[in-house]
Amino acid sequence: MILFPAIDLKEGQCVRLVEGRMDSATVYSNDPGSMARLWQDQGAQYIHVVDLDGAFAGQPRNRQSIAQIVQGVQVPVQVGGGIRDLETIEDLLSLGVDRVILGSAAILKPELVAEACRKYGQRILLGIDAKDGQVAIQGWGETVKRTALDLALEMKQLGIERAVFTDIRRDGKLSGPNLAATGELARNSGLRVIASGGVASLEDIRQLKKLEQDGVEGAILGKALYTNAVKLPEALVIARGEESVC
């Protein structure tokens, strides 16, 4: 299982939010590039970046910080937040971003998802952000009458093979991931799923590891790392199935 340290960008700073609320931001670093290197040095195989300003604005706002992150590490980087046209996708990939995540665009512009998948294949991921079972878009500020599974199946038909699934109610709260919903989505959609939201302990990672057989291939770690609730090297041992930690 792959663990993705998260770097959430707000005005060029690394922050964490609670339930996606911008007024809840806690700043952890003013240097996103060095934060990415820190996680790489601790063993990260992949970095997950979210442009929070972009998610709310509908277009990327932290391009320079994203470039610093990509240029500062040797591991691949995936980026989401405000990516709603092909030009933005191409720009991010030209910076060296490995994969881009389309969230609101899946609802607002499904034709973009289809075109991007045709052009870039597995470099395009679906971002499913759910609140109380309903998909949320536009920086999580609006819910639509669509379930996570409905959206996953629709996007699978357009070429999507992998999705990041975030339970908004758990994001930034260290309350544990929504194991049931994550496992069900992977099983019933046939997509490879990366879990996001609520991971708070090594035990949470153990439980997510058990869902690998259902198609859960990774987990995003945010606040747990920044508050030292979870130490990345120990978490990676569990993710690799080399359990002798704790």
Curated annotation (Swiss-Prot):
Entries under InterPro entries matching the protein: Aldolase_TIM, His_biosynth, HisA_bact_arch, Isoase_HisA-like, Isoase_HisA-like_bact, RibuloseP-bd_barrel
Record localization: Cytoplasm
Pathway per the UniProt entry: Amino-acid biosynthesis; L-histidine biosynthesis; L-histidine from 5-phospho-alpha-D-ribose 1-diphosphate: step 4/9
Keywords: Amino-acid biosynthesis, Cytoplasm, Histidine biosynthesis, Isomerase
Signal peptide: none
Gene Ontology MF annotations: 1-(5-phosphoribosyl)-5-[(5-phosphoribosylamino)methylideneamino]imidazole-4-carboxamide isomerase activity
A cellular-component GO term for this protein: cytoplasm
Positions of the catalytic residues: 8 (proton acceptor), 129 (proton donor)
HAMAP family: HisA
Family: Belongs to the HisA/HisF family.
PANTHER family: 1-(5-PHOSPHORIBOSYL)-5-[(5-PHOSPHORIBOSYLAMINO)METHYLIDENEAMINO] IMIDAZOLE-4-CARBOXAMIDE ISOMERASE
Record's protein name: 1-(5-phosphoribosyl)-5-[(5-phosphoribosylamino)methylideneamino] imidazole-4-carboxamide isomerase
Species, as recorded: Desulforamulus reducens (strain ATCC BAA-1160 / DSM 100696 / MI-1)
Origin organism lineage: Bacteria, Bacillati, Bacillota, Clostridia, Eubacteriales
